[in-house]
């Protein structure tokens, strides 16, 4: 099959520059980096349009929808094609191996993430030219890990081409053509030892409190036999603070801002830039790039209006639809509102040694010693 040399990264960037598509600051920085490579400004890596389009052609021709319009061709959105081209199309000029081996994607719910990952897993199993590929779809619980896996298996059932090469077994998908396997795994599996994944798919990492599962899978990808392993984490925001989600989010932010160097780490963080934007319909696309096509705009409008009238529902919308951090599912202040990192001098605030304030129902006592705040005591 002929591979067209479409450049979806450049097309997306053009729409961003013209204002046709609005993106958040983190996506803008990611796109700047990708365009810089495409422009030939990187001595080590370049954009290969044939390699970039291979997974897109595979998915749109051989992966069929397993929900809704069952059996119909799966057509990818522009932002999904951009993600795939960035992962598979930016390669080393000499070895032609992929630049990125770890990808972190944060996106609002109902933007097709499970469908994209399940199709990508099938590509990794059959279309990526990997010998003995091992696709491990992991989560904290096996039932959660099977969400993406079951979607992949249903795609195989709907596709005559995939059925020809991929067999559905009790606990996995098996490809006799290249001795490949696609399997769901979890931290409560009997063992995670002896794995040799060519691709790891970690879904909904916001729910992971213990980072052990992430660490085990990262270590499993260290085998010399895998020249370009791929670790993909995809998630919405969540309520667990200081977990692996926060760590990956902060690390991605550091890489984007230049505070950390990691040429093999790529992120696509779709989010609102500020809390105020949740009430502005024109900004919703920042966290929901599939709005109006994959995700229902009327339904999102309905949820936002309900959240305005129901305080307990508001954190769910802010966190899951717009990827704004919240402390808990029932919190009424967002992480953005609570997390004030502004610095100040004690002299500017306190004129006496002891000062008491009544703040949100709690008495806070501050003590000034040597021009610094020495202690904060909450009563």
Residues covered by each model-derived region:
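Metal-dependent catalytic core segments for phosphate chemistry
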Residues: 363-379
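Phosphate/NTP-binding elements of NTP-utilizing enzymes
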Residues: 2-358, 366
């Amino acid at each position: 099959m002929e591979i067209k040399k479409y450049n979806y990264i450049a097309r997306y960037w053009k729409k961003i520059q013209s204002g046709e598509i609005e993106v958040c600051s983190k996506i803008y920085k990611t796109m700047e980096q990708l365009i810089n490579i495409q422009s030939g400004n990187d001595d080590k890596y370049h954009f290969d349009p044939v390699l970039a389009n291979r997974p897109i052609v595979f998915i749109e021709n051989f992966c069929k929808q397993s929900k809704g319009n069952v059996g119909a061709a799966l057509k990818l959105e522009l932002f999904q094609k951009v993600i795939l081209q960035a992962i598979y199309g930016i390669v080393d000029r000499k070895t032609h191996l992929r630049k990125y081996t770890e990808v972190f994607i944060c996106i609002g719910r109902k933007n097709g993430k499970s469908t994209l990952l399940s199709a990508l897993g099938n590509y990794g199993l059959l279309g990526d030219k990997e010998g003995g590929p091992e696709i491990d779809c992991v989560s904290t619980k096996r039932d959660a890990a099977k969400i993406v896996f079951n979607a992949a298996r249903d795609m195989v059932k709907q596709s005559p081409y995939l059925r020809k090469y991929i067999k559905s077994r009790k606990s996995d998908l098996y490809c006799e053509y290249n001795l490949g396997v696609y399997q769901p795994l979890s931290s409560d599996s009997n063992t995670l030892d002896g794995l040799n994944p060519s691709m790891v798919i970690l879904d909904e990492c916001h729910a992971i409190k213990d980072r052990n599962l992430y660490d085990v899978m990262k270590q499993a990808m260290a085998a010399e036999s895998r020249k370009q392993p791929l670790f993909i984490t995809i998630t919405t925001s969540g309520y667990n603070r200081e977990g692996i989600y926060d760590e990956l989010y902060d690390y991605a932010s550091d890489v984007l801002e230049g505070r950390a160097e990691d040429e093999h780490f790529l992120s696509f963080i779709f989010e609102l830039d500020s809390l105020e934007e949740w009430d502005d319909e024109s900004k919703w696309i920042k966290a929901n790039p599939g709005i109006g096509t994959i995700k229902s705009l009327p339904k999102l409008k309905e949820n936002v209006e309900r959240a305005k009238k129901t305080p307990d529902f508001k954190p769910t919308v802010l966190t899951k639809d717009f990827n704004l951090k919240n402390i808990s599912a029932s919190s009424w202040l967002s992480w953005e509102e609570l997390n004030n990192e502004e610095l100040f001098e004690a002299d500017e605030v306190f004129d006496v040694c002891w000062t008491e304030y009544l703040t949100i129902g709690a008495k806070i006592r501050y003590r000034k010693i040597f021009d610094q705040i020495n202690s904060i005591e909450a009563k």
